[in-house]
């Protein structure tokens, strides 16, 4: 079973994934290659900070929510993700997870949760493997940016919606 989690930044996708992990699911994030690449590049932020120093101190969630640097960290992630998809194809972030699932399942059905389904083709990938998409919404949560990755998925791709406060 593959469960893909969809929703704005900060609505609780990672918290939901942690609950599923306690039930035997393995967690994957489509953004993992983006984050690894950005840490290798280690861009400079303002006031002597680098991305790696910010992430080391705050974690990725803290870096993305940081009052001074959060918008820039998000902009870097979005730009790199867009560039990777343009240069290497829409599946550039999906393929590593596909390979990992194939390696770990060994012919059996693995229980997988993907924490960051943002685009229709990502949701279609989950569904094509017999999975489902859960949209997580929270009162007052708004998109972190105007980027296409912050738009809701088409309703036909969403199996369930969880709404919290």
PLM region spans:
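Hydrophobic anchor at the beta1->P-loop junction of P-loop NTPases
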Residues: 5, 114
């Amino acid at each position: 079973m593959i469960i893909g989690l969809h929703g704005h930044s900060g609505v609780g996708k990672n918290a939901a994934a942690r609950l599923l992990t306690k039930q035997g699911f393995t967690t994957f994030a489509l953004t993992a290659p983006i984050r690894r690449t950005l840490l290798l590049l280690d861009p400079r932020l303002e006031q002597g900070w680098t991305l790696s120093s910010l992430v080391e101190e705050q974690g990725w969630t803290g870096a993305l929510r940081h009052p001074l640097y959060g918008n820039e960290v998000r902009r870097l992630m979005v730009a790199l993700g867009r560039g990777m998809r343009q240069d290497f194809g829409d599946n550039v972030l999906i393929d590593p997870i596909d390979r990992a699932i194939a390696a770990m399942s060994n012919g059996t059905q693995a229980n997988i949760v993907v924490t960051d389904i943002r685009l229709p083709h990502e949701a279609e990938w989950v569904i094509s493997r017999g999975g489902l998409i859960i949209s997580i919404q929270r009162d007052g949560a708004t998109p972190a940016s105007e980027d296409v990755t912050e738009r809701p998925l088409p309703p036909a791709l969403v199996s369930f919606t969880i709404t919290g406060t």
